Curated annotation (Swiss-Prot):
GO terms for molecular function: hydrolase activity. It is found in: Spore coat. This is Putative sporulation hydrolase CotR. A motif (GXSXG) lies at residues 42-46. Its EC number is 3.1.1.-. Gene3D superfamilies: Cytosolic phospholipase A2 catalytic domain (3.40.1090.10).
């Protein structure tokens, strides 16, 4: 059995329902799963899950609040978003996150270790922008940060939501924070690599692809600026309006988010071998900002075969 156990949660907006339902099924079948986990880490909506668990909330309670209070914040979509306008008003999401946690709850107060990626648009100390990995390991400069602020700093996805306190969504750093979590376990907790196990729970693997000639593409086209006819816009790396169902709407941004998620899994698997397990069921190309997809996402989570994950948990978290 591994001596140091980490659980990670990807970003993914409304698709966070998938990872939460998978977690609920796993926790029911493995009652000691949460109590025997040393580190919870997550990005964007995954940071909400991670810090909820680290603060002592149950998977069931977290999922229920997600469905009742977090999802409604995604129900209002502004005209033109996310291409020509910020897609979602952020105020509802901010209120929902703040209401779930005590107003004065700080990272130092959490029962478990956490790692949450974000990206700071300007650091006065460095005089540039910079990745940030919020954590509460000993010596952390972030111990007095409010839990709700850390979640919101990790969740402001460019084009979908606005920056929060000069921070944007952690997906520009790590959609899947598993490698960062391993690094903190080794570097901050002094745990040998061969004693670490990671259960990494995603928000669904979609068949996103781009199979067209990209010669001549820029980030935007002149016709994309105040367009008169959206149907005749030329394709580019910034936005692809004439797309098939499995092509990305925002090619460059979605490559960053999707690519680094796969990369993190590859690196973590190479570091840990069979002590790394990725649970990320295949899903259709669902919207990450549409609450209407949640029933279908929950159904996929309920039909996912958890036997391999349960075997991994039994081996590395201990018997039920």
């Amino acid at each position: 059995m591994a001596k140091y156990r980490i659980m990670t949660f990807d970003g993914g907006g409304t698709l966070g329902a998938l990872s939460l339902q998978l977690l609920n099924r796993l926790a029911r079948q493995n009652p000691k799963l949460i109590s025997r986990t040393h580190v919870f880490s997550g990005n964007s909506i995954g940071s909400f899950t991670a810090l909820a668990l680290a603060s002592g909330r149950s998977p069931r309670e977290t999922l229920q609040y997600f469905e009742d209070e977090i999802l409604p914040a995604f129900s209002i979509s502004r005209p033109g978003g996310p291409v020509f306008n910020q897609q979602l008003p952020y105020s509802g999401f901010i209120k929902a996150v703040r209401n779930f946690f005590p107003a004065d709850l700080q990272l130092i107060d959490l029962r478990k270790r956490i790692v949450v990626p974000s990206f700071k648009l300007y650091s006065q100390k460095l005089d540039r922008w910079t990745p940030v990995l919020f954590h509460n390991f000993p010596g952390s400069p972030y111990l007095n940060e409010k839990v709700s602020d850390v979640i919101l700093r990790s969740s402001g996805a460019p084009a979908t939501q606005r920056a929060y306190q000069n921070y944007v969504d952690g997906y520009v750093v790590a959609t899947n924070p598993s490698t960062a979590s391993i690094a903190f376990a080794v570097g901050k907790a002094n745990v040998p690599l061969d004693q670490i196990a990671v259960l990494s729970i995603g928000t669904g693997e979609a068949p996103t692809r781009l199979r067209r000639d990209t010669r001549g593409w820029g980030m935007v086209s002149a016709d994309n600026i105040r367009p008169e006819n959206l149907k005749n816009l030329p394709p580019n790396w910034g936005v692809l309006l004439d797309r098939s169902p499995n092509e990305p709407l925002l090619p460059f941004l979605q490559m960053i988010a999707g690519g680094n998620g796969y990369y993190e899994s590859m690196v973590s698997a190479n570091l840990l071998g069979d002590r790394f397990f990725r649970l990320d069921p295949r899903i259709p190309n669902f919207s990450k900002t549409d609450p209407a997809v949640v029933p279908a996402v929950i159904e996929i989570a309920n039909k996912t075969n958890l036997q391999p994950a349960n075997q991994f948990i039994e081996k590395n978290w201990g018997s039920k």
